[in-house]
Amino acid sequence: MVASGLCHSDDHMTTGDLPPGLLPMAGGHEGAGIVSAVGPHTPGWEVGDHVVLSFLPGCGRCRWCASGMQNLCDLGANVLTGCRTDGSFRMSIDGQPIGQGAGISTFCEDTVVDVASCVKVDPDLPLDKACLVGCGVGTGWGSAVNAAEARPGQTIIIMGIGGIGINAVQGASHAGATHVIAVDPVEFKRETASSLGATHTFATMDDAAEFARSVTNGQGADAAIVTTGVLKTEHVAQAFSAIRKAGTVVVTAVGNVEEEVRVPAFELTFFQKRIQGALFGASSPSRDIPWMLQLYQSGQLRLDELITTTYKLDDINQGYADMHAGKNMRGVIVY
């Protein structure tokens, strides 16, 4: 491994919001590195290849992969279990199996990964930046471009400006939205959003929704993307009330497995509003990771500015403490 982003999803496992698989488990799911060895049955891969790891594997054969929805590949059923697709394990301590987070465990200096989770990238790319597209950037960008289907002239609200929300801002801006509205109570996150494409920022969702109505003749936003740190019922309800008729709420944030969504049924039917889930921003890793990195190389997607602090692996707990304190847009472990 060369680098790994500190994503909130790993923290969700420690809090129980996401059920962990086999414990103990080596975490990390947003990483990039250089191939040091290849096993059998891996044509097309060589020692020295530079790769971004995808926390969602793609078999290329199932219904979802064949339909262009690689993020829903059937192999993803093992993402939270910690084991390989054949039920075996690639890590152990004193003979005891160790689970691999998302099958890739990027919080390790070395890891064993199935080729289904590897995306080969340009060796000239800085891997400490490229690692971010493996989750946070791809998830946020795709939430705006793919799930919300942002278009020129639209009004898009992004609720929660962290490692995912900031990239939804970039995606909505790149798609040509006229009003890109970022919502976060932390001032430095609002300032960062303004520098990366947000046209307006607000500390509260109420203020953002009021502004959206003021610039759309009272209709509301075309889409509201929920990228809060921990999803709560009220987040979806607030987003739902902020969108226009036939508008879309994109739910990207992760909450407790028992968290429920409650919205007015009347508006759902008579206003034809839509609630759309988004896993990895409805992106297909093998297609969209290289594309996003090409955008980075051409200056249309900014990655360097996302990294607030870099850490050594031994300082991972400090990195997550900084995340909880609202100090980081994205922390990155550099090996």
Predicted regions and their residues:
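Cysteine-cluster motifs in flexible loop/terminal segments that predominantly coordinate metals
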Residues: 55-116
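Local beta-strand N-terminus motif with an aromatic residue
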Residues: 48, 153, 198, 220-221, ...
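Redox-cofactor binding/interface segments in oxidoreductases and associated redox assembly factors
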Residues: 2, 53, 158, 225-226, ...
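Cytochrome P450 core scaffold surrounding the K-helix E-X-X-R motif
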Residues: 9-14
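Mid-domain Rossmann-like dinucleotide-binding core that forms the NAD(H)/NADP(H) cofactor-binding site
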Residues: 50, 109-110, 116-118, 122-210
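Glycine-rich beta-strand-centered segment in the early N-terminal region that forms part
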Residues: 2-4, 17-66, 71, 79, ...
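Glycine-rich cofactor phosphate-binding loops and adjacent beta1-alpha1 units
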Residues: 148-151, 187-274
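C-terminal hydrophobic helical "lid"/dimerization subdomain
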Residues: 206-207, 237-241, 282-335
